[in-house]
């Protein structure tokens, strides 16, 4: 499935739900004349990634320009974040879970129509996939998507109305249903509907869903971004483990410069460099819990084998 197909597929999935609207917060300007300020509006599970990346980029930017740069981060469900920009959040860049969400901002006249071509790999500097996070020992013996529709299995996943990760979760389940039922759409719909009947909590974003499962102890299985699941296991290796479904989906988060805002803010060059540097060797090593696009960096990354990408 190429990027354009994914955009259409996610748009179709999103159309099944009532669109949620979340308001956002505005930004800045730097009081210090020698300091550039950027606002990066991003999706939920990228907090740690951009905390580390921003530190590296600040050093790089200082070396290249002689100027200091301050980066303001905003995180939340990808759909809600896109709408916050449309409604007035003065983001310089967006780094969102779905190309579809950036397309919404583009259609609002804030991003150039050729944004997909502005950066390599269709403006997708890293990828991920969807896995299951279960409690240690896997007490419900969850091994594949089929197990999520069994009676008594309590599933946690975010809300597709506001979360990009939730849309990828939906598409992963749909892909499994299509293969299992030989592309029978009605049977696939019934399968996915049965899965969502077992969902007890739908938070607005992926990080909220992780908190519900990991910290609040709710649910038997969390459908999660791979990098989010890896972080949970790293932090509590005796409490959780990852289950790899037989079929998943290659999730491609996207990035773009908010051209209308950077023109007003005078930050166009800094914003472009901020996103371009995500493709550097140094940044690709930081993105180690995502599926980086640099082959050398990927060699040292904690990667898990997958089947059934499309």
Where are these regions (language model features)?
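Short beta-strand->loop
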Residues: 41-43, 134-136, 154-181, 196-199, ...
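Periplasmic-binding protein-like
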Residues: 124-129, 192-196, 203, 235-263, ...
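N-terminal segment of the mature folded domain
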Residues: 31-162, 302-305
